[in-house]
Amino acid sequence: MKLATWNVNSLKVRLPHVMQWLETSQTDILCLQELKITDDVFPVNELAMMGYGAIFAGQKTYNGVAILYRQDTVEAPTDIQINLPDFTDEQKRLVAGTFETKAGAIRTICGYFPNGAEVGCDKYAYKLAWLVKLQSFVKEELGKHPQLALLGDYNIAPDDRDVWNPKAWEGNILVSPAERAAFQGLLQLGLSDSFRLFDQPEGLYSWWDYRMLGFQKNHGMRIDHILVSDALKTKVKSAQIDKTPRKWEKPSDHTPYVIEL
C-alpha cells in the first residue's frame, strides 16, 4: 500500500492535478497541505466519486490540511485530532486519524509546519514553539500507536544533501540550526526518515521556487517528509519523490513524496 504527502498550494486550483495523480498512482492514503479553502467548500463529492474519503481542517486563503483515504483499501479513520492539543492556534496545520489498512492500524498525522519567514522574527519564534509542542504530541501518540507515520510539508531541509546550494542557504530559514535540531528531536523519539532508509541519488528535492526557473535548474530543497515509527520502518519497501506533477501546467511548487509498504 502507498502513503504520500503533497503540498498542493491551493486545492481549489490544484484539484484536477490531485484527481489525475490519484487516478494514476492509486495511492491509499494521501496527506495534503496548504488547502487554502474553508471546510464548507472542500471537494467531498468529487473525491467520493473517485472512491476516496477525507478528513480535513481548512481555512480561507492560508494553511489547511487533509488526509484522503481510498475507501476500498482503507477503513474510515477513528480517533480524529484537529490541530495540536493544548496549543492555542487559529492556523489549521494538523489533522490526524487512525486508519485500518492491509498493513494494520496506522496512526497517520498530517502536518503543515510553519514556514518561519525569517530567522529571528516573530513567525520564526512561532515555528519553534509549534515544533516543541509537536514533539510532545508525537511522543504521546507513539506511546499509544506502535505504527505511526508523520507526513507533511515540514519546511525543514534536514541536512545539506537536501539543499541545492547549501552555502547560499547557510543559516537561513528552513536550514537554521534550531530547525534542524527540531527535526532531529523527532528522530530521537524513535522515528526514521523514510527517504533515507534507501540509497538515494544526489539532487532529489520536493520543492522548487517558482522564480528564476527553479524547477528547470533543479534548484530545490527536500522539505516534504514522511517519518515512520520502528514498527512501520521494517515494512517500507520504497520511497520516491514523484516529479511528474511538477511538470504539469500551473503546478504546485511542491511535488508528491510517496512510500510503499
Give the location of each predicted region.
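N-terminal, active-site-proximal structural segment of metallo-dependent hydrolase catalytic domains
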Residues: 1-49, 60-65, 158
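Structured beta-strand-rich core segments of catalytic domains in phosphoester-bond hydrolases
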Residues: 35-38, 42-118
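Metal-dependent phosphoesterases centered on the DNase I-like endonuclease/exonuclease/phosphatase
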Residues: 50, 130-223
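Active-site beta-strand termini and strand-to-loop segments that position acidic
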Residues: 70-71, 97-103, 229-230, 252, ...
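Surface polyanion/phosphate-binding segment centered on an Asp-His-Pro turn
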Residues: 240-261
